[in-house]
Design a protein with these regions (language model features):
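Polyanion-binding surface elements
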Residues: 3-21
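Major-groove DNA-recognition helix of helix-turn-helix-type DNA-binding domains
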Residues: 19-42
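Short boundary/loop segments of OB/S1/cold-shock single-stranded nucleic-acid-binding domains
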Residues: 52-71
């Protein structure tokens, strides 16, 4: 037996939340032909088109560092929190809709002069990345 999976589509509000923009922005993109919609009512955005647009948006973020690196997972964002406790520090970076948390030495946090509002690049190099999907 062949298994045919229905194409994933998203409501405008879901697409907006996933892209970190307002519903109105998604509607404008639809009106401008940037995002297609399926023939359903209310309008739904095909998942593959939404994914392609998410990649375009992500590549628009300027990486302020002038470094070459083997790490490919780079999150440009703003430091939102620095909590120093003894010899360790927790630094939170908000990169679009993504919150990246780093644990580092308090000395490193001070040397980097990290504080809320600082521009930073969270660089992730991992040997394991777990992918999850919602159950249907």
């Amino acid at each position: 037996r062949g298994y045919v999976r229905r194409m994933t589509t998203y409501r405008i509000s879901e697409a907006a939340r996933l892209l970190g923009v307002s519903d109105d922005t998604v509607r404008r993109w639809i009106d401008q032909g940037i995002l297609p919609v399926s023939g359903e009512s209310p309008a739904r955005i095909p998942g593959d088109a939404l994914a392609a647009h998410a990649v375009e948006l992500a590549s628009a973020a300027e990486d302020p560092s002038d470094r070459l690196s083997s790490a490919r997972n780079r999150f440009v964002g703003l430091v939102t929190r620095v909590q120093i406790d003894g010899v360790m520090a927790q630094v939170d970076v908000q990169s679009g809709p993504h919150r990246v948390v780093s644990l580092m030495s308090a000395e490193a946090a001070r040397e980097l002069e990290l504080e809320p509002g600082s521009l930073a690049v969270a660089v992730v190099k991992a040997t394991t990345v777990v992918i999850e999907t919602p159950r249907d």
